[in-house]
């Protein structure tokens, strides 16, 4: 599977409004719509010399380095929390498709309640999901046209995926095609309209010019979903538990970006005394939206 490069996007994906330069590093730019606030990288997803996106071309070794992170109980807890959220709106035994399944933690947890399968463009991640998570994950992308999927699923999930997609409208349209009548879509993504994002500005930790090519606010993502035939039924934020060692290291990595983050990192150094301890964190800057597919023509 080879994801084609898309044309450089000069206008907003959501409202077609003009964009203004917000951040530039090397040949990568981050542009924000002056009308609705949608923020994107015009150059789209990074491609490797072989013409593959970075999500298709990563090796299995990349995932092997993060074995402990992916199998950590907090990662599984986060996946199970999402599965429980889905279960509030979708009956047990329903057919579920997880888009961008990564190493299969959510598919594994969802399989306890649903007939769940995942698609993931990275062969290394798929191999890891099968070997370590024993999850039903296939190599594939939401942009692949799979006729057998049309109208098949009672639920489609896109957890921490849409920010990596440079054609989010097309991705949501395909999700809608794969849903059965009255099916449910579940999306989580960083909220660039959140208080935390506004406080940190360009130093916000979800500003990533390599990977996060589409950044939404709650308002403009709701607008995009409505335009693709979805009715919002639930909104919430998501956090998770993190090891002290992970928090301290992440703050160290980010501390060069702003004076505020340098101060926060300095205050976090005592976390090294108990690296294996966990703390729950929810800054309110990761949104979750549950949306029901409206009947055609409504």
Q: Where are each of the predicted segments found?
A:
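A generic structural motif
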Residues: 114, 230-231
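Conserved N-terminal segment of class I S-adenosyl-L-methionine
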Residues: 1-159, 169-173, 237-238, 249, ...
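Short, glycine-/aromatic-enriched active-site segment of Class I SAM-dependent methyltransferases
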Residues: 187-214, 219-225, 246-252
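Short N-terminal helix/helix-N-cap motif within the alpha/beta-hydrolase-1
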Residues: 166-170, 197
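A transmembrane-helix-recognition feature enriched in membrane-embedded lipid enzymes
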Residues: 259-285
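A short glycine-rich, Lys/Arg-flanked "PGG" loop and its adjoining helix->strand segment in the class I
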Residues: 169-184
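A short His-aromatic
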Residues: 160, 164
